[in-house]
Amino acid sequence: PIILAPMAGVTDYPFRILCKEMGAGIVYSEFVSADGIIRENSKTLNLIRFEEPERPIGIQIFGSDPEVMSQASKYVFEAFKPNILDINYGCPVPKVTKKGGGSAALQDLCLMDDITAAVVESVPEIPVTVKMRAGWNNDSIVIPGVGQRLENIGVKAITLHPRTTKQRYTGDANWDYIKPVSYTHLRAHETK
């Protein structure tokens, strides 16, 4: 299926409906702060509200504290019942990464594991997915090893933005990062 990626300031209700009408099989909300969710911030909650015709739909959250991410995940599931919960490890924007959110997790893989495990354990009813970048910079590419780590924790799918955090949205995407992740994943399933 065609999957609409979560994009801040883009994937709002009208855009999601338009994409559904044009054939998108799965759509995602804009990414939202786990802190905003547990504080029940009305602006944050309005970003993730959706209507039944949008299903299947994923809600994407970000944060840097495993307990807060767990609480936010439970809240989202209980209040909204999305089909998928997605963790953002891909946002390169400094106002997010300075607080440890988004792609900042690529600098502390143990924390990434803890956050991911907390989310997976808090919503066993639905699949948890991850959107991430290839690494923090060209000297710290974490793909493909992180893909296997996340799968072992219980992540059901990974969306890879084949750029680094430092590249932000400029420069060439390195499509060579994707092939080893796909190949590693396929080989692991062949041997099971």
Briefly describe each language-model feature range.
Residues 100-106:
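Short glycine-enriched, charge-decorated loop/helix-capping segments at active-site entrances
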Residues 7-83:
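Glycine-rich, positively charged N-terminal anion/phosphate-binding segment
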Residues 185-192:
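Single conserved hydrophobic/aromatic residue that forms the stacking wall/gate
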Residues 74-85, 94, 99, 111-167, ...:
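Alpha/beta enzyme core
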Residues 1, 24-25, 52-57, 81-83, ...:
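Short, well-ordered coil/turn segments that N-cap beta-strands
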Residues 7, 32-34, 62-64, 90-92, ...:
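Active-site beta-loop-alpha junctions enriched in small/polar residues
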Residues 1, 38-41, 46-56, 91, ...:
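N-terminal small/glycine-rich loop or linker at the start of catalytic domains
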